Amino acid sequence: MSTYTRPVKLLLCGLLLLTLAIAVLNTLVPLWLAQASLPTWQVGMVSSSYFTGNLVGTLFTGYLIKRIGFNRSYYLASLIFAAGCVGLGVMVGFWSWMSWRFIAGIGCAMIWVVVESALMCSGTSHNRGRLLAAYMMVYYVGTFLGQLLVSKVSGELLHVLPWVTGMILAGILPLLFTRIVNQQTEARYSTSISAMLKLRQARLGVNGCIISGIVLGSLYGLMPLYLKHQGMANASIGFWMAVLVSAGILGQWPVGRLADKFGRLLVLRVQVFVVILGSIVMLTQAAMAPALFILGAAGFTLYPVAMAWACEKVEHHQLVAMNQALLLSYTVGSLLGPSFTAMLMQNYSDNLLFLMIASVSFIYLLMLLRNAGQTPNPVAHI
């Protein structure tokens, strides 16, 4: 059977449109708030409300999928996200926008849980790496194109909201032409997120998602600041960030293919070692271009491989709950990592960005090496 079935292709098409909308709003909302003369701390609170919504949406989407299935959960998630977008045009103000961004955060998290869970339930141990690699490629391409859109179109609030809302609603259309089977409704057992987080044999995957959140959150959030402090102009910063993200896009398919062929454990070890190597090279400031490229290629592909590892350790009816646990772990890492790293950079040195990334990656590498006796690709429950 083909890895990229018709439902998978249509699901990824819808995700591309939704990711474009997410990228545009995540870039423009802080700018709109600044134009409205809101203080910096309020801009930060609005951003935090979005991520809080992500956490809330992650927690209950599994129950929703079990009750109404993948398709209806996807439709509902998209409509919630669209409502959060439309609400921004109702009233510009701190409390109003904090509420609407919270709602948008819930919708976005629901979309991610539905898409990731559907892909994992559609795959097997032999092709999940490629499925998740395709998912991440679509996500990063959508993010890149969203940034491109921001630079090419009018950034006025009332000009942007109509076409972004239309794009969100258009993201629903592909799934109207297919049905994603939810086999979890046939399961007799109920699985909780906490049970998945405590599952000993999947701990490497959970820890990998936390580390991935720390690494990517720090690179996304703090790399532009690091480059700015090196005296670079905005155009140069944009170029180097494009190198980083492009490397992440290019690395997805080959890494996913290698993980399917040679096993997740071996590939995870190599990835983490390469992240450490890239961080050390960045500390020496010897060769920024290759260092950033290998950081992007290894760091941006860590999440899907760690996710595939964890999913091989559970029964088929536990996949949605496991995906919730992994996405929750990633979100926590992406929230805590940049916050702690930013404090270190402010109080000591900007180089602590890469020292922090190398340190947490080294800890994870030790965890991976301790599991040398385990089979790299455990038998999956199909």
Swiss-Prot record:
It holds the Pfam family MFS_1. The keyword Cell membrane applies. The chain crosses the membrane at residues 14-34, 45-65, 75-95, 102-122, 131-151, 157-177, 204-224, 235-255, 265-284, 289-311, 325-345, 349-369. Keywords: Cell inner membrane, Cell membrane, Membrane, Transmembrane, Transmembrane helix, Transport. It is found in: Cell inner membrane. GO terms for cellular component: plasma membrane. It is a multi-pass membrane protein. GO terms for molecular function: transmembrane transporter activity. SUPFAM superfamilies: MFS general substrate transporter. It comes from the Bacteria. Gene3D superfamilies: MFS general substrate transporter like domains. PROSITE patterns: MFS. Belongs to the major facilitator superfamily. YcaD (TC 2.A.1.26) family. HAMAP family: MFS_YcaD (MF_01149). This is Uncharacterized MFS-type transporter YcaD. It comes from Salmonella arizonae (strain ATCC BAA-731 / CDC346-86 / RSK2980).
